[in-house]
Design a protein with these regions (language model features):
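Acidic, Ala/Val/Gly-enriched low-complexity intrinsically disordered segments
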Residues: 2, 6-9, 17-19
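C-terminal beta-sandwich interaction modules and adjacent acidic
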Residues: 10-14, 21-391
Length: 391
């Protein structure tokens, strides 16, 4: 390698045989910019290899409070006298090197990303993923002299607090990296010197941290979810009735669904009751968001698309005859496998997740009798952990 000093600000380095014989690279260093030019066998042919190899003059990083996570409080639950409001706490650290920089602003924000799961039709691949700000963008630093667009930024730490709205959906990871996720983004906008071949321009250096939002209003121990209720369905002009009773309407991973099913008959003709079947469905609803990049006249908004899958089943055999004035009942216990459940998702921009239970009486000699659409809330914790959190 041969290095030739042309001027105090320009250095030419010629490196032989970089990729192929008789090919050379000339690296031009000017001020804080660098350009690599690759020459072929003929000197008048060249290919730019890197138009900007400079690193950022300031390092930016995010740091959570000492021995604490970024997220404080209980997302989904408002703050109170003894409970801090839910939000993201932390510090943006700016570290400037030996060369001073001029900056325009330092900001921090929360972004929510929603990726539609596979199997749902979208108009384009771009429409499958959307993102939006959560709350306001917080500006931590600007030039003190309001007449200046840029000013010198020194090494500093900026503490911040970003409140979390109560109605945001929780983090949920679905198949093939789809679902809802959040990230904390900190950025600094500074003036980048162009050097010999480029004009001065602004550049943005940013850093991100993943945030996992757990919604505590979904905890199954809240009194709202522990009020018994009843559902019913009839057949044969009301002569046959099925009643489903449940003690609570929410559960979490490793919990069990408990309910009682009762079948009554007032018709003269007896029939055989084989048993009860229960099916818990996970219902995913996707609302397609039109792309903001589409400059054409917006088309008619497509209705939401819903798909369901079975996440748990239970059967209770009876195999007895039911006559006029008689009844058959069963206490049904449905265990929940933790690896098959997500959580209830409300207020998503494009994704919502719900859970519905269907209880069916399997009989011979009468029309199908079923109670459908019994809604449940699925939280992030088991009932035992939820009780501790609520206390």
């Amino acid at each position: 390698m041969v290095s030739i000093i042309v001027s105090p600000v320009l250095c030419i380095r010629v490196i032989d045989d970089v990729e192929e014989p008789h090919h050379y690279v000339i690296n031009l260093l000017s001020n804080q910019s660098a350009v690599d030019v690759c020459f072929g066998p003929l000197l008048h042919t060249y290919i730019p290899r890197s138009l900007d190899t400079m690193s950022h003059p300031a390092r930016i990083s995010l740091r959570a409070p000492p021995h604490l996570p970024f997220i404080q409080g209980f997302p989904g639950i408002p703050g109170g006298p003894s409970r801090r409001p839910p939000g993201v706490h932390g510090t943006v650290e700016i570290r400037v090197g030996a060369v001073p920089i001029k900056a325009k602003w330092v900001r921090v924000e929360i972004r929510k990303h929603e990726v539609i799961p596979p199997g749902f039709k979208t108009s384009s691949s771009e429409d499958r993923s959307t993102w939006e700000h959560v709350g306001e963008i917080q500006t931590l630093w600007t030039p003190q002299n309001t007449t200046k667009e840029f000013d010198v930024l020194e090494t500093a730490d900026f503490k911040f607090f970003l409140p979390l709205p109560e109605n945001i959906p929780p983090t949920v990871m679905m198949m093939k990296e789809s679902g809802i996720r959040y990230e904390l983004v900190a950025a600094v906008c500074y003036k980048q010197k162009g050097g010999m071949f480029k004009k001065d321009a602004s550049s943005v250096n940013k850093t991100t941290e993943d945030l996992r939002i757990t919604k505590h209003e979904l905890n199954s121990a809240w009194p709202l979810y522990n009020q018994p209720d009843t559902f019913n369905a009839t057949a044969a002009n009301g002569a046959i009735e099925m009643i489903v009773q449940r003690p609570y309407s929410a559960f979490g991973p490793n919990d069990r669904i408990l309910l009682t099913a009762v079948l009554k008959s007032s018709q003269p003709k007896p029939f055989r009751v084989k048993g009860f079947e229960c099916t818990l469905l996970e219902v995913v609803t996707v609302t397609q968001i039109p792309s903001s990049q589409d400059k054409k006249k917006p088309k008619k908004v497509a209705p939401p698309t819903t798909k369901s899958r079975t996440v748990a089943t239970a059967r209770y055999p009876i195999d007895e005859t039911l006559g006029r004035g008689g009844e058959k009942s069963a206490r049904i216990d449905i265990p929940m496998a933790p690896d098959k459940l997500l959580v209830t998702v409300r207020n998503g921009r494009s994704i919502e997740v719900g859970y519905e239970l269907e209880v069916k009486a399997v009989c011979e000699g009468i029309p199908e009798l079923a109670v459908k659409g019994i809604k449940y809330v699925v939280g992030p914790f088991s009932r035992a952990h939820s009780q501790q959190a609520v206390r």
